[in-house]
Amino acid sequence: IIDPEGYPHYERSVTSLRYGSSSRNKEAWNKRFGNDNMWLSKTQSELASIGFHGTGAFCTNTYSKIQTHNQSNPNAPMTLAPSFGFLSQFRSQNGHAYPGNTSDNELGLVLYSDWAEFCKTYIRSAMASYLNDANVLGFFSDNEINFSSQNSRILDRFLQLTDRTDVAYLEAKKFMEEKNATSVTDNLNSEFAGRLAELYYKGVKEAIKEIDPGMMYLGTRLHGTPKYLQHVVAAAGKYCDIISINYYSRWSPELTTYVKQWGEDWADAPFMVTEFYTKGVEDSDLNNQSGA
């Protein structure tokens, strides 16, 4: 990545930089740091010593502290990449209902005509403190949208809605009629999911381009099935500056198949991995039963 001053930047970040909530965390934090300035100064220095210079999507209540650190330490900043909830906020602020009253179908909200205008309004309010900040690498508009899952295709879900006036049902029905199809296939589902993805990403990208054209759009952290849907990845590549992928369910990267397709065939944009498996070292007291 080329930074705002024209230099190459290798983005290596920790996804979560925030206070721990346990008494053990609090005791250790107070003993080692004692205050936010010391915490962030030491953290920046230690992370930089092993080649990490940024923070990611889950730094709840820490982003403003990082910005304060950056202002006080312009030669030792940490990049920020905050994550937002565009779809859930669109639902609550504009008074829409999830199709079928389930958040699994939240992507159907982009079919409402006020989606694009909402994106502009939301960016101006929720992202105000990050606009025109050179240390903000970019932003994620949502996290792991359910474009489909292994056992639940979005086209099937929309066609099964009982409210025949719902915009999601009507769009799915129209799509099937357009394709002269009577049953859902994986290819049809990928294409339909891609159409919805196009509406979603287009709304966000055009909004940020109007408000802060220097801000990079990092997408929605594709995970699970969605990262394997060609039409979804293509839509992300059309509007995102960098496609973000949360890479789980594989111990080793699929270099000759999907990784190659993401980077060379499916999308006209680079991608970066924003989450992946990691485990504790053998001499730690971690049980290694989880590893996000």
Spans of features found by a protein language model:
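Polysaccharide-binding and catalytic clefts of secreted carbohydrate-active enzymes
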Residues: 101-112, 129-231
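Short, acidic/turn-prone active-site loops that include or flank metal/cofactor-
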Residues: 84-89, 247-250
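Residues that line or immediately flank small-molecule/substrate-binding pockets and catalytic motifs
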Residues: 15-16, 59-62, 139, 143-144, ...
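Structural recognition of the beta-strand scaffold that forms the well-ordered cores
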Residues: 2-3, 9-13, 53-57, 79-83, ...
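Short catalytic/ligand-binding loop motif for oxyanion handling, primarily in non-cytosolic enzymes
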Residues: 10, 63-67, 89-92, 145-151, ...
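Glycoside hydrolase catalytic-domain groove-lining segments
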Residues: 182, 187, 191-287
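C-terminal structured "cap/appendage" subdomains that terminate the fold
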Residues: 290-292
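Active-site-adjacent substrate/metal-binding segments within catalytic domains
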Residues: 1-76, 89-138, 187-190, 194-195
